[in-house]
Amino acid sequence: AECKVDVDSTDQMSFNTKEITIDKSCKTFTVNLTHSGSLPKNVMGHNWVLSKSADMAGIATDGMAAGIDKDYLKPGDSRVIAHTKIIGSGEKDSVTFDVSKLTAGESYEFFCSFPGHNSMMKGAVVLK
């Protein structure tokens, strides 16, 4: 099993994937996030955040208040399973997390917590 995925983000407020499948034989899983657009992070920054689907809206709302210096995430938010930092044009960041944090049958989503982005920039994370 390949225990990693490359995800690209764009100036059009999009990720290049809508679903990420994680093989349950993976002990850890790595997400490599890139930004192929031309806009800086304060204008069109993106991050990759993993949480239960039910927690996404609350994380995004609290993240807006936290601001860009905190990567639009409330510091120490226990609902966040994994996240990258906010990146802009030409930048990249990676995050590796323990697959044991995920439960089969639970609904997980990945999204960007930059204000207003999670309506379009989201997808499913499936453990199988």
Curated annotation (Swiss-Prot):
CDD domains: Azurin (cd13922). One of its GO terms (molecular function) is copper ion binding. The keyword Plastid does not apply. Keywords: Copper, Disulfide bond, Electron transport, Metal-binding, Periplasm, Transport. The keyword Electron transport applies. Disulfide bonds join C3-C26. Residues 1-128 form the Plastocyanin-like domain. One of its GO terms (cellular component) is periplasmic space. Its main location: periplasm. Cu cation binds at H46, C112, H117, M121. Pfam families: Copper-bind (PF00127). InterPro entries: Azurin, BlueCu_1, BlueCu_1_BS, Cu-binding_ET, Cupredoxin. It is found in: Periplasm. Transfers electrons from cytochrome c551 to cytochrome oxidase. PANTHER family: AURACYANIN-B (PTHR38439), OUTER MEMBRANE PROTEIN H.8 (PTHR38439:SF2). This is Azurin. It comes from Pseudomonas chlororaphis.
